[in-house]
Design a protein with these regions (language model features):
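Residues on the lipid-exposed face of transmembrane beta-strands in outer-membrane beta-barrel proteins
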Residues: 56, 60-62, 82-90, 124-130, ...
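Extracellular loop and loop/strand-boundary signature of outer-membrane beta-barrel proteins
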Residues: 68-74, 109-114, 157-162, 219-228, ...
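Repeated loop/turn-to-beta-strand initiation elements of outer-membrane beta-barrel proteins
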Residues: 95-97, 135-138, 183-186, 249-252, ...
Length: 330
């Protein structure tokens, strides 16, 4: 296994050297036009002298339900969802660099129950590319996903489920990007490192998010502090992105990520599929429908049972949100 890992890392190094070494023929490749503002979620501020494109947006979605003597039943509720994103893009000759940050945080107050979190996501992305044809580039990407605040079980408030960097998922990959238009891109990497970090020792001891659980002593009980806090994987990775206007002021965006571990059940592919349907009402108001599907063969999720104790198992995870609110672009 170590020899396979060494071979994969060597392949990564060779691809990087190929990306960075000077190649005179590449100078003949026509420069791809600067990425227009429409290719991003938000409008961009362009510095034509330096080749930089920068932009971002903040959205605040709000919903409220109030019931009083409502015969059909139901529950009053109040929810707030904050969404922020920012990006920068640089292009000069055959070289390009992209960086982006996305933050989502939501709060829910159902009836007289305590305030709880219903969404929490922090994602950072960076990419370097070196173009060698009109539609193909060597590329290196780095992705980080985690959350900001602790998450506890609704029925057991003292039971911690996750927190900042517990987990954190890091993908480091090198490969080839195919980009025929500014609306679509496909990145394929045969050498990608996936790192799962569980920064909380209690969660690590429980084997949460696929890390190795704590060892057990002679009495059969877990030995505290022996759970591993890092899981390392090497495999193939695919990232496909699409941004397609459907009609005036209506845009569909999709991102599909697939990862296959070379050394452990490679047929069980990890899936992360994000979809967004965005409706622009006017300059400041917008509505959107978002749906995310996730499957990770190494992550066990809680399974509730009515007639027997709760268990944990592999499941397809799905999240859908509908929002209407204020949007500020910069």
């Amino acid at each position: 296994m170590k020899q396979l890992l060494l071979s994969a890392l060597t392949s990564c190094a060779l691809v990087l050297l190929l990306m960075l070494r000077p190649v005179t023929t590449l100078a003949q490749v026509p420069n791809r036009a600067p990425v227009p503002a429409e290719a991003y979620k938000v409008s961009a501020e362009v510095d034509t002298m330096q080749g930089w494109h920068r932009g971002g947006a903040g959205t605040l979605n709000f919903s409220q339900v109030s019931l009083s003597n409502w015969a059909a039943g139901g529950q009053s509720s109040l929810s707030l969802l904050a969404i922020g994103n920012a990006y920068t893009h640089y292009k000069e000759g055959v070289h390009s660099f992209d960086a982006a940050a996305d933050l989502v945080y939501g709060l829910l107050k159902p009836g007289k129950s305590r305030l709880r979190k219903n969404d929490d996501r922090l994602e950072l992305n960076s990419r370097y590319g070196r173009q060698f044809t009109n539609v193909l580039s060597y590329a290196a990407q780095l992705n980080l996903k985690t959350q900001l605040t602790p998450t506890t079980d609704i029925e057991k408030p003292d039971s911690l489920l996750s927190r900042f960097f517990a987990p954190a998922f890091i993908l480091a990959s090198v490969g080839i990007e195919y980009k025929p238009t500014e609306r679509f891109s496909l990145f394929l990497s045969p050498a990608t490192g996936k790192f799962t970090i569980v920064g909380d020792q209690t969660l690590a001891d429980a084997g949460a998010f696929g890390v190795r659980a704590a060892r057990r002593g002679p009495d059969g009980l877990p030995i505290a502090g022996t759970g591993e806090r890092l899981r390392e994987e090497m495999g193939a990775y695919l990232n496909a992105r699409l941004r397609q206007p459907i009609m005036e002021n209506v845009t569909y965006q999709s991102r599909l990520e697939l990862f296959s571990n070379y050394f452990h059940n490679p047929q069980n592919v990890d899936v992360n599929w994000e979809n967004l349907l965005d409706f622009k009402i006017n300059k400041f108001f917008s509505a959107n429908v978002a749906a995310t599907l996730v499957y990770d063969d190494d992550i066990l999720v809680p399974i509730r049972h009515t007639d027997q104790p709760d268990t944990r198992g592999k499941r397809i995870q799905f999240k859908e949100t509908l929002g209407l609110g204020l949007t500020y672009k910069f």
